[in-house]
From Swiss-Prot:
Source species: Xenopus laevis
Record flagged with keyword Glycoprotein: yes
Glycosylation site positions: 55, 86, 125, 129, 143, 153, 157, 164, 169, 179, 206, 222, 267, 304, 331
Descriptive protein name: Glycosylated lysosomal membrane protein A
Cytoplasmic side: 387-405
Motif window: Lysosomal targeting motif: 401-405
Segments crossing the lipid bilayer: 366-386
Length: 405
C-alpha cells in the first residue's frame, strides 16, 4: 500500500515538472519590427515605432521625445494595420491628428504613458521619505519636455530590437548635465523569456521593456534622491495599482514584490494595457545585490496640470485628450532609509514592462524546478526502495522457514 502511494506521488511530481517545462514552450510569439522615423529622413526628432504582429492582431508601440517623452500602445485586431505619420502636422504647433492607425476600425484599444518630470530632493535625515519631505528641501523639478534629445538613429538595432533615447537639460543653470544624461532604453521581444540584465524581468511577446537611467548627472546636493513622475491615459475607467508577492527571489535577491498598474475596468469585454515592474532599482551599472535601491510607488492622483501640446499623445488622441480621457499622475521614488545617496555612484537604473493583455507572471526557473524535484523526489524514491527491500526480506524469511515436527 505504501509502495503504491509512493509511486503515485513520484509520478504526480514528474507530471507537474513536465507540465511546467512544456508550458514554457507553448507561449505565443510575434513577428516584431522596429523602425525609426517612419516616412521621414529627419533625424533631429525621434519617433521609434515597434510593430508586433501575430495571433490575428498587431500591437503598435510608438515612442517619441517630441514634446513630453511618451509611449503610445495601440492594439488592433488586424495583422495588416499600419501606422501613418503626417510629419508636417506632427512638427507643427497643432499636431492633433498627425498620428493614426489604418484601418482605423481595426483599433480596439489605445493608451499612453508620459514621462513628465524628475524630482530631486535633499534627504537631510536619510529617511527616503519622498512624500513626507518638506517642500523647502526640493530642488526645482526637471521638466522632461524642456530637454534636448540626441538622435536615436545610431542606437537603433533591428536585430536586438532595441533603441536609446538620451536627453540633457541644456538650460540648467547649475550645469548638472555637463557630463551626464537621462535615458530611456527600449527593448522589444518576439517571444517569451527573461532578461539577462537585472532585475531579470520575465517578458512575453505582448510587451516591451523600458529602462529609465540617470547617469553622470551631478546632484545639486550631497544627499540627493530622485523620483520620476509619469502620467497615464485611459479612456474607459481609471487605473489601479496591484501588488503581487512571490515566494521566490531567485532573480532579484531580497525582492519579493512585483507592482502593476492596470485599468480598473472589471466589466470590460477585452484586455487592456499594463505597466509592470519589480520594486527595485539599481545604483550601479553592474546591477548586483549590493547595488539594490528599493523603489516606492506613490498613489495615483488626477493630473490637472497642462502639459505641452506637442507630444505624440496629442498627435494621436486629438483635442479631446483632457475631456474624453482620464489622465492620472503617479510618482516612483528611489532609495531606502539609511542607504546610499545618488552621489555615491551617480547612477540610477529602473526597469519596467509596458504591454497588452495579462501581465507576465514570475515563475521558478528550470534549475529551481529540478532542485525541487530532486529534493521532493529523493525521499519518495528512498521510501519506495526501502519498502521493496523490506518486502523482499520478509518474503525470504518466510520462504526459508521449515516447520518443526
Amino acid at each position: 500500500m505504501g509502495c503504491t502511494r509512493g509511486w503515485r506521488l513520484l509520478l504526480l511530481l514528474g507530471l507537474v515538472c513536465v507540465g511546467a517545462l512544456q508550458g514554457r514552450g507553448q507561449e505565443e510569439s510575434r513577428e516584431v519590427s522596429l523602425q525609426y522615423n517612419p516616412g521621414s529622413s529627419d533625424t533631429s526628432v525621434n519617433v521609434v515605432h515597434v510593430r508586433a504582429v501575430g495571433n490575428g492582431s498587431t500591437i503598435h508601440y510608438v515612442w517619441s521625445t517630441i514634446g513630453t517623452p511618451t509611449v503610445l500602445l495601440i492594439f488592433t485586431h488586424s495583422e495588416t494595420s499600419q501606422l501613418q505619420v503626417n510629419w508636417t502636422k506632427l512638427l507643427s504647433p497643432a499636431p492633433q491628428g498627425a498620428l493614426r492607425i489604418e484601418p482605423a476600425e481595426s483599433v480596439s484599444y489605445a493608451t499612453a504613458l508620459l514621462f513628465t518630470r524628475i524630482f530631486e530632493y535633499q534627504d537631510v535625515n536619510n529617511t527616503a521619505n519622498f512624500s513626507g519631505t518638506d517642500e523647502k528641501y526640493f530642488y526645482p523639478a526637471y521638466n522632461l519636455s524642456d530637454f534636448l534629445w540626441d538622435s536615436a538613429n545610431a542606437t537603433i538595432n533591428a536585430t536586438s530590437l532595441s533603441a536609446n533615447l538620451t536627453g540633457y537639460n541644456a538650460s540648467d543653470p547649475t550645469d548638472s548635465f555637463h557630463n551626464g544624461s537621462v535615458s530611456f532604453r527600449i527593448s522589444a521581444y518576439s517571444s517569451s523569456g527573461r532578461d539577462s540584465s537585472s532585475p531579470r524581468l520575465r517578458h512575453t511577446a505582448n510587451c516591451t521593456k523600458l529602462e529609465f537611467l540617470v547617469a553622470g548627472v551631478r546632484p545639486r546636493g550631497n544627499n540627493s534622491r530622485f523620483a520620476l513622475e509619469m502620467v497615464t491615459i485611459e479612456k474607459e475607467g481609471r487605473k489601479k495599482m496591484e501588488s503581487v508577492h512571490s515566494i521566490d527571489d531567485e532573480y532579484t535577491p531580497t525582492i519579493f514584490e512585483m507592482m502593476q498598474l492596470v485599468p480598473d475596468a472589471p466589466n470590460s469585454s477585452h484586455a487592456r494595457g499594463f505597466l509592470q515592474w519589480k520594486s527595485v532599482a539599481y545604483g550601479s551599472p553592474s546591477g548586483t545585490r549590493a547595488d539594490i535601491l528599493p523603489c516606492q510607488l506613490h498613489p495615483l492622483r488626477p493630473f490637472n496640470t497642462t502639459f505641452p501640446a506637442g507630444s505624440i499623445a496629442h498627435a494621436y488622441f486629438g483635442d479631446d485628450l483632457a475631456d474624453a480621457y482620464k489622465l492620472e499622475a503617479f510618482n516612483i521614488s528611489f532609495g531606502i532609509a539609511d542607504g546610499d545617496f545618488y552621489d555615491k555612484n551617480r547612477f540610477l537604473s529602473w526597469s519596467a514592462l509596458i504591454g497588452y493583455g495579462e501581465p507576465p507572471r514570475d515563475s521558478f526557473s528550470i534549475l529551481v524546478i529540478c532542485i525541487m524535484a530532486v529534493a521532493l523526489g529523493t525521499p519518495l524514491l528512498l521510501l519506495i526502495v526501502g519498502t521493496l527491500v523490506v518486502t523482499a526480506l520478509r518474503h525470504k524469511v518466510y520462504s526459508n522457514y521449515e516447520p518443526i515436527n
